[in-house]
Structures are given as structure tokens and as C-alpha cells.
Amino acid sequence: MEKMHITNQEHDAFVKSHPNGDLLQLTKWAETKKLTGWYARRIAVGRDGEVQGVAQLLFKKVPKLPYTLCYISRGFVVDYSNKEALNALLDSAKEIAKAEKAYAIKIDPDVEVDKGTDALQNLKALGFKHKGFKEGLSKDYIQPRMTMITPIDKNDDELLNSFERRNRSKVRLALKRGTTVERSDREGLKTFAELMKITGERDGFLTRDISYFENIYDALHEDGDAELFLVKLDPKENIAKVNQELNELHAEIAKWQQKMKTSEKQAKKAQNMINDAQNKIAKNEDLKRDLEALEKEHPEGIYLSGALLMFAGSKSYYLYGASSNEFRDFLPNHHMQYTMMKYAREHGATTYDFGGTDNDPDKDSEHYGLWAFKKVWGTYLSEKIGEFDYVLNQPLYQLIEQVKPRLTKAKIKISRKLKRK
């Protein structure tokens, strides 16, 4: 096994084709981290010219100290049963990490627990310290240890039927409601950033500046690994649909009124059907007024939600999502999610990752809402083997490990205060 020098394109091709590859190991992802002070180095090992393992090493300075942290997010990308390749990757990583004055090498492989016996044993044998099997969204991890993933390698009907029943009904309703899902361009990031600001204010979290999303889009879109989707509501088109539905409801009432005259047996049923239709008419009249007001203010329509969809080979990722406070009954997010899944499948993906979650949290947990939303999309829980640290500077590592919990608690307090505002 030997060190290899490969191009960025060769690195990315290996990551995209490997079962343990991940978006965060793509070279263009490292470009997105520069804004937050990270810089990258890359390593590869192989035999007889064939690559057998790669890793993208991210480095960040420790504040006020001449040291760095080496973080291999969702790496190494290697077969963890191949001890020789794994050992060679660690040797290469140590060489670079020491040159960059790293106090530790942190990894969190994209390897699931039920397939991770070799990885756990072999990493520990090499001297890595396992950080344990904590909850998926534990503050002790950089990346979530658990994510929710929908298999999308199926036709439209099979995909829809894989969703939970109530969610399936909502998706079908969303498809009828009259919103349009657009695959947007860089210019659409302005709209997306505005929607993200609204979402942050509603849900109580700090949002990123538009430059952050532009950075991701610019780095990854050219290779087809980042797409922006927006959901639009056209008032004129939907007013026509509401008028049609109102006409149908009035015709329905007339039909049941006629039956009441000709059949006493059906009188009770007819009255119930009439009452139901009248309730629907009232709701549609309210909706029509809202749409007419929208048409006056925004005749071209408004955007209700948006999301960034990412790719790494056969894996797709729902990375960031945002939505308006208006016209939520149109279920724009349901329309968007189903459309993005189909788009991802058509572009070679077999899985759709909804991102981090805890495993079946209590209803009073701050993470319950996330889990409840993600579990209804035909998802399974992808539980990773977690984080591992390879310590290079023991005194500094111990000091930072002691200080970290206090910093984490301070961040949590600040976050909770923001949510209460």
C-alpha cells in the first residue's frame, strides 16, 4: 500500500462511487468551508495505481493558540475491513496533521452501526478513541450521528405509497392545490434567503447570510451537486380553480336539494351533504378573497418555500429548507419534497437523506418536531458509528475536552433565549 497523488476530479470520482462516500468529502465542499475559517488537504492510498482509500482533511485554528484541529468529516472513505489501506490513510493523515500542528484528528465515518463491526474494531486497534453512541443530535458531535433516509429507487407510485398514510394524502392534496415547483438558478437564492429569514424568525434559530448559500451553490452547482428548488403560488391560476370548485359545489347542493324533494328517506343524508358543501363553499370564498388580495399586491405570484438539494453519487441530501408563513394550507413543502425526490432519482440517486434526528424522542423534546416530520416520508433511521478522535497532543486535547462542555452549555443557553424572544 502506498501514498498516491491524485487530482481533485479523481478524488471526487472515488468518493461518489464508494459506498462510504459522502457529500462532505467532495473537494468542492471544502470550498464552502473557507468562509468559516477551514482549509483543506487531501490524501489517497492505493496499490498498483488503483485508489483504495481517500480522505479530505479540514483544518481550523484553535483560537489564540498555535494549534489546529484536523477534522475528516464523514471520512475516511475506505473499506474499513481493509486494515492495510486504513493504516496507510492514518499514517498519511498523521504526517499532514502534525505538519499543521493539529492536536487531534477527528473522524465520523458514513458507516452504519449494523455494518460497522470492522470499522469499530479496526479504528480502536489503531488508537482511535470512540466518542460513544449518544443521541443523533447530541451537542457532543459535529455531525448528526443519526439521519433519516428515504430509499427512492422505485417508481412514482411505489415512492408515494412508501410514505405514511396521512402524509401520502397530504402529498396528493398538495399536487392538486395549484403550486408550481421550480428548479431555480443563482438569482433565486435571494428569494431563498428571504424565506430562510422568515423561517428562522418563526422557529427561533439564527439564519445564515445569503453569501453562505451563494458559496455552496457556486462551489457545487457546476458539477450538478447542488440545485435550488422554489415553490410558487400563482394567484390568477388558483382563482380560476377556486371558481371551478365553487361552481361544482353549488351544483352539488342543487342536486341534493332535488333529492330531498323526491325522497324522504334520503332527506337526512341530503341535508348532511348540503351542510358539508356549504362549509366548503365558505372556506373557498375566504380563500378566493385572499387570492384576489394577493393578485392585487403580487400579480406575478409569490414564493412559499424553497430548498437546497445536494448530491454525492447515488446519495442525495435535503440540506436546507425554508418556508413562508402565508398560504400554508397549500402544503408547498409536501409538493417540493416529493418533486425533489423524483428529481434526485432521475439524476442517479437511490437515497434521499433528510438530515439529522434523534431516535423517537419524547414529545416534550426540542427535537420531536424534526423527527415527526422526517419519519413520515418512508424513511429509515441511519445510525452511524459516531465520532473517533486520534490524539496527537494529549495535554491540549484533555484541556479542550474539559472546556468544551462549558462552551456547549453557553451556546445552548443563548439559543434558548433567542427562541423565547
From Swiss-Prot:
GO biological process: cell wall organization; peptidoglycan biosynthetic process; regulation of cell shape; response to antibiotic
GO cellular component, one term: cytoplasm
Keywords noted in UniProt: Acyltransferase, Antibiotic resistance, Cell shape, Cell wall biogenesis/degradation, Cytoplasm, Peptidoglycan synthesis, Transferase
Domain of life: Bacteria
Record's catalysed reaction(s): beta-D-GlcNAc-(1->4)-Mur2Ac(oyl-L-Ala-D-isoglutaminyl-L-Lys-D-Ala-D-Ala)-di-trans,octa-cis-undecaprenyl diphosphate + glycyl-tRNA(Gly) = beta-D-GlcNAc-(1->4)-Mur2Ac(oyl-L-Ala-D-isoglutaminyl-L-Lys-(N(6)-Gly)-D-Ala-D-Ala)-di-trans,octa-cis-undecaprenyl diphosphate + tRNA(Gly) + H(+)
Cell wall biogenesis/degradation listed as a keyword: yes
Keyword Transferase listed: yes
EC number of the protein: 2.3.2.16
Database matches in Pfam families: FemAB (PF02388)
Alphabetized InterPro entries for the sequence: Acyl_CoA_acyltransferase, FEMABX, PG_Glycine_Bridge_Synth
Self-association and partners: Monomer.
Family in the record: Belongs to the FemABX family.
Function: Catalyzes the incorporation of the first glycine of the pentaglycine interpeptide bridge, which is characteristic of the S.aureus peptidoglycan. This glycine is added to the epsilon-amino group of the L-lysine of the membrane-bound lipid II intermediate (GlcNAc-(beta-1,4)-N-acetylmuramic acid(-L-Ala-D-iGln-L-Lys-D-Ala-D-Ala)-pyrophosphoryl-undecaprenol), using glycyl-tRNA(Gly) as donor, in a ribosome-independent mechanism. Involved in methicillin resistance.
Note: Since cross-linking between the peptide strands is critical for maintaining stability of the cell wall, FemX is a potential target for the development of new antibacterial agents.
Record PANTHER family: LIPID II:GLYCINE GLYCYLTRANSFERASE
Protein name: Lipid II:glycine glycyltransferase
Lineage: Bacteria, Bacillati, Bacillota, Bacilli, Bacillales
